[in-house]
């Protein structure tokens, strides 16, 4: 969706749910190479804060209406909505090691 690999080589990919607490999100994001976060919707502000606290905001993309005909992709730092549509995910890309 973003045109970039999610992971590289031996990177660890973690799938997270946005319903986790902010602290849990920060802990998980800080200890993985790449992540996909589901259940973004009403949890967007908490997820955004966790990504910022984990210092990963430059790696984050939001995909609205994932896998649908009206899908859109945007860097999370450029996303201005306070709530994401139901079929949204956040992708945190890993880096080559």
Pin down the residues of each PLM region.
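A contiguous loop/helix-start segment that scaffolds small-molecule binding in enzyme catalytic cores
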Residues: 31-97
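Class I SAM-dependent methyltransferase SAM-binding "motif I" and its flanking Rossmann-like core
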Residues: 1-28
